[in-house]
Amino acid sequence: MRLTRYFMPVLRENPAEAQIVSHRLMLRAGMIKQNAAGIYSWLPLGFKVLRKLENIVHEEQIRAGHVPMLMPTMQSADLWRESGRYDAYGPEMLRIRDRQDRDMLFGPTNEEMITDIFRSHVSSYKDLPLTLYHIQWKFRDEMRPRFGVMRGREFFMKDGYNFDLTKEDALHAYNRHLVSYLRTYERMGLQAIPMRADSGPIGGDDTHEFLVLADTGESEVFYDSAVTDLTFGDRDIDYDSVEQCQGVMEEFTNLYARTDETHDQALFAAIPAERQRQARGIEVGQIFYFGTKYSDAMGAKVQGPDGKPTAVHMGSHGIGVSRLVGAIIEASHDEKGIIWPEGVTPFHCGIVNLKQGDTEADAACDALYASLRALGLDPLYDDRKERAGGKFATMDLIGLPWRITVGPRGLKNGVVELTSRKTGESSELPPEEAIEKIAKIYAPHHVSGNL
């Protein structure tokens, strides 16, 4: 994309309403615009990141054997009355009445709707196990929306639901989701720690939240520092293997890690003092097992092997996709701006022309731009007639991992400058070598065209 043809309304000054780094940088980088309290338009740069995160979530869900679908944002209140949650959910639920005087709601979650879909179409244990998921906009009428997309009223979320014949099968689904989430977050350049948590209004006995450690996090957390040394890496997991998924589950949850709602001081005190940590974290996902809570209430049953009807065991699993954008920025920034991990960057690299209008510099930039695009990469070419300092400041603010700087002096020596946003280190090399290096860097990140 050429910057002269792109819509990226960057701000020079820090917005007064922004209280945390991610909110400030998303506004300054022209990623979002607030339309109402806790409700944002996603401008092109922010939308690209949001879509990249969504694609990663889809890829990892499908890898785990989960089936994508799409449910509506509007739901009938009757389903929620059936489960008993319509009155219990509280004022966070936006209740609406249509022209036929029917009670509706803007869905904050989808347990009731997915249970209704399941009971309408599945009647035999032979159709199990089954996990369905979708990625959709949700609405929760927060009393005090704040911190930009971190605590908004409208948010983009992946929620999945598993249906199993037995508790053992459902707990395997729970472990399978934990494994898929670990893969998902690592692909995004995040370390998200699974922590024992409270189930809240969704209910159930087993639940883990995935938290990214950050000073601006709303959750107080207590953990054994050894959990921060755990990485999933590139291990190949058979999601159908109970033993493999259980092994990963135990590896990542046996060490103490809990939110304040479930914190046990006695257990925490048993950790060696030098490994005890108390910090703050940003919740970016949660998994639940809630047994037959919804299937009992809503009659979601299948005919078992013995021919008798039996209520299915269920779980739900969520990832806050829009919140992840803010969480990544909170975890990866400096005083100049955002530092995007290579797996989620909106553009793979930036091209800065130091002398726009110079025939040789323009031609070299055009050639770089065309070559990168031919390899399936997505560069952002700053072709504005702007001073070099302004171009560098823009690139630093929006945080692209790599910048290729092209100027007449370097071209006389047959080189361009390649700079890492993360380290600030630069090297001079021929244009074709810069292209080759960028291509190698992004080879592991599933480059599949431009969004």
Swiss-Prot record:
GO molecular function, one term: proline-tRNA ligase activity
Keyword Cell membrane found: no
Key words, A-Z: Aminoacyl-tRNA synthetase, ATP-binding, Cytoplasm, Ligase, Nucleotide-binding, Protein biosynthesis
EC number(s) stated in the UniProt entry for this protein: 6.1.1.15
Listed GO CC annotations: cytosol
Localization per Swiss-Prot or TrEMBL: Cytoplasm
InterPro entries (alphabetical): aa-tRNA-synt_IIb (IPR002314), aa-tRNA-synth_II (IPR006195), aa-tRNA-synth_II/BPL/LPL (IPR045864), Anticodon-bd (IPR004154), Anticodon-bd_dom_sf (IPR036621), Pro-tRNA-ligase_IIa (IPR002316), Pro-tRNA_synthetase (IPR050062), Prolyl-tRNA_ligase_IIa_type2 (IPR023716)
Reactions catalysed, as given in the entry: tRNA(Pro) + L-proline + ATP = L-prolyl-tRNA(Pro) + AMP + diphosphate
A Pfam family per the record: HGTP_anticodon
PANTHER family: MITOCHONDRIAL RIBOSOME PROTEIN L39/PROLYL-TRNA LIGASE FAMILY MEMBER, PROLINE--TRNA LIGASE
Subunit structure comment from the entry: Homodimer.
Protein family according to the UniProt entry: Belongs to the class-II aminoacyl-tRNA synthetase family. ProS type 2 subfamily.
Biological role stated in the UniProt entry: Catalyzes the attachment of proline to tRNA(Pro) in a two-step reaction: proline is first activated by ATP to form Pro-AMP and then transferred to the acceptor end of tRNA(Pro).
Name the UniProt record assigns to this protein: Proline--tRNA ligase
Gene: proS
